[in-house]
Amino acid sequence: MSFEEGADLNASHCCREWLAAVLGNTHVRWGWFVEETLVKVERFPAHQPLSWPQQTELWLAPVGSAPLPPASPWVHQLELSQVPLRDPYPGLGLDRALALWAAGIHYGWPCLVIDAGTALTLTGADSEGSLVGGAILPGLGLQAQALADHTALLPKVQWDPQDPLPPRWANDTVAAIRSGILHTLLAGLREFIADWRRRFPQGPLLLTGGDGKWLHPHLGPLDPELRWDPHLVLRGIAGCRQLHRTARHSPSAE
């Protein structure tokens, strides 16, 4: 599978068009940009063989086990040290840093990002753009997979963003698994959000990640500043690229 097949866009040698890629554990997300505008996003299974574009500027955020493309002068691999988030701790996930920094520069500081992917993470920064801290827990799919893998009789439950919230007191096994995972997850997130608001009464809250679309309508009534942005990490990559290009063309760099 190649990105061009899904995007129907041609590679450009003039650097107006370029590609960002987030290499995760379960998926690879490609974002095609024209200058700073995100025009197309595609998602592929992480270990599916991919045909990477040739002679196209490519910025990578390796955040999981997906294989890297071949090295070339066109490929730029980001590291945590290149994200201008203040006071990150060693080992902070690159995707968490990119999403938080993008949230801050696009929506304002202080901010809290809830990334509902394979792992669900909460990451916050204060009004100065300094990391406050966060939390990591298994995402919806990983919790369901753990029950199926480590019990003899429980089935694996699939999620659909269109599914309504199940009844809390379920009367069959599948509904009981859904209830247990979803209601306890929402209760925990509400408590984290309430604690964040005690510390930072103002500022945006951002949901991103594959399960964020499902979480948004269930958490949105809790806080009017909660927004859903599925492309925060890609926006963070774009911001880092812009900083790199600005620094390279500044008088001090000549």
From Swiss-Prot:
The gene is coaX. One of its GO terms (molecular function) is metal ion binding. This is Type III pantothenate kinase. Its EC number is 2.7.1.33. It is found in: Cytoplasm. It comes from the Bacteria. NCBIfam families: baf, PRK13331.1. Keywords: ATP-binding, Coenzyme A biosynthesis, Cytoplasm, Kinase, Metal-binding, Nucleotide-binding, Potassium, Transferase.
